[in-house]
Every structure is written in structure tokens, then in C-alpha cells.
Amino acid sequence: MELRIVRRLIPEWGTTYGPPGEGPFPAVMILHGSEGAWSGWSHRNAVILAAHGFLAFPFGYSSGGNAWNAGSIVDHSLERSVEALAALRAFPYAGPRVGLYGVSRGAEHALLLASLMAKENKTGLPEAVAVHSPPDVVCGAFDSRSYRDSGDPGWQAWDASKRAWTWRGEGLMPTTPIEVEQYPGPLFLSHGTRDRMWSVEMTRRLEKRLQAHGRKPEAHYYEGEDHL
């Protein structure tokens, strides 16, 4: 049987991937990690979701970069992400239920976006959030031009003065706990138990934080698996 995936453009925002037909389809906004918008991974994930009946929108939010360089995640306005989510929700092919899916820095992005929107009672809150390899705190800015693996002669210390995210014009302070309990909808959490980049304990803390507030997140831990 032939599998067809249809690309449809959200004007001024970017492409979506979805099944053929007029829809509407359940929609998902995909948030990439530090690999950046140009890497293609979020588009690959969008195609997989489209093959399962979703309208998937890979929202590229990193700054700069190209096919060889990931760019940076510095001072990204989360209000811009609220607008992107609203654009997907208003897209004629999107159904009334819209979710968020993020991996690594995209997972952080998704949790921050959902919790801050909920805390301020903003309209258009996602109906569900799914994240893989998330942190439980706000992390600092990322610039691929200066990033090196530990042990590399060009390695540089993390610049604590830079911020990855802004909200209402203010930078979000690294190490601040993400108030995931503010989000009232269903949450899916997953993490590899041998993650060498971000410890699985961060997801365990998120799960415990939610449980302490009477929530029952769906959490999955993949034995022996690394970050992605």
C-alpha cells in the first residue's frame, strides 16, 4: 500500500506534514533540540507523526545556523512560540486538539511553554505535552560555534551570563525549577537510563514533582539507552 505524506505551508511560519485529505487532523508542534532547525531531525519526526495520522509542524526557533552548523539557542522569546502554536491551531487542516512534542532542549522548551502559559492563564494552551530527555530546570544558552565536547582542546566553560529563553522580555534564570505542575493537561515523560548528556534523574524529579501535586504523568524509562 502506498504511503502518502502531504506538505502544507502555514504562511509566514513554515511547512507542516500530514496525511492526504481535507482533515482536520490532530496536530502537533515539534520543538527541536540543540541540533538546530536546519538539521532535519524535527522534520523527520514530523514525517513519522504524519504517517500515523497527525498534522505535524516542526517549529524552527534556533538562531542562525545552516546545514553544517546548528546555530544557537540564545534569548529566544517564548512569546514567539505562543504565536507559532496559535498559528498551527488556526491552520484550516488542524483539528481542535493541538499538542507539543520536544526532545532535549526542545523538551525544556515544551515544558517551559506549557507551564508559563498555564501559570498566566493564556488562551490556546496545548491539549497534551510529550517530552523525551527533558531537564527539570531552566538551562543556559547554547551556541554551537563555541560548543566542544569535554576533553576537546577548544572546550570552553559555559557562559552563565547568557540566557536561552525570555518571557515578557526577561531572561529566564538557569537552574530555576520548571514549574511543570502548573500545566493541567496530560504529560508524557521519557528518558534513557544511561543518558550521558542530561541525567535521567531530572525526569525522575519531574515525575515526583508532578506526583506531589496529585498528578499522574505517563513516564517511561528506557534501560541502557543514551540521550536520544
What is the predicted function of each stretch?
Residues 102-106, 110:
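Gly/Ala-rich beta-loop-alpha elbow adjacent to hydrolase catalytic centers
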Residues 71, 204-228:
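C-terminal catalytic histidine-bearing segment of alpha/beta-hydrolase fold enzymes
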Residues 196-205:
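Conserved alpha/beta-hydrolase "acid-adjacent" motif
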Residues 23-25, 33-66:
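Short substrate-entry loop that stabilizes the transition state in hydrolases
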Residues 1-23:
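N-terminal cap/lid segment of alpha/beta-hydrolase-fold proteins
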Residues 71-92, 112:
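Alpha/beta-hydrolase active-site loop
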Residues 183, 189-191, 195:
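Short beta-strand/loop motif that positions the catalytic acidic residue
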Residues 112-168:
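Hydrolase active-site cap/lid region
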